[in-house]
Amino acid sequence: MAHTRSAKKRIRQAEKRRLLNRYHISRMKTAIKRITEALKNKDIETAEKLLPLAQKLAYRAAAKGAIHKNEAARRVSRIYRKVNAAKASLSQ
C-alpha cells in the first residue's frame, strides 16, 4: 500500500484512467462485434449502417489515449475491408 499522499493520489488517478480506457475500448469492440455478427448473418445493410459508429468509437478511443492512433486506423481499415468484401461477394 502506498504511504505518501502523492502515491495515493497516483493510485486513484490510475484507477480512473483504467476504467475510462476500459469503457472506450469496450464500446469500440462491441461496435465491431455487432458488424461482424451482421456480416455472419449476411446482413450487409445493417453492417454498413454500423460502420460510421464503429469508426467514430475507434478514433475517439485513440483520441482519449485508450489505444494508439495506428491501432484505431488498423481496426477501422479491417472492418471496412470485411464489409466491402462481403458486399462484393454478394453482388457477384
From Swiss-Prot:
Name of protein: Small ribosomal subunit protein bS20
The keyword Ribosomal protein belongs to this UniProt entry's keyword annotation: yes
Cellular component GO terms held in the UniProt record: cytosol; small ribosomal subunit
Protein task: Binds directly to 16S ribosomal RNA.
Family stated for the protein in its record: Belongs to the bacterial ribosomal protein bS20 family.
Record GO terms (molecular function): small ribosomal subunit rRNA binding; structural constituent of ribosome
BP-aspect Gene Ontology terms: translation
Domain of life according to the entry: Bacteria
Lineage of source species: Bacteria, Pseudomonadati, Aquificota, Aquificia, Aquificales
The entry's keywords: Ribonucleoprotein, Ribosomal protein, RNA-binding, rRNA-binding
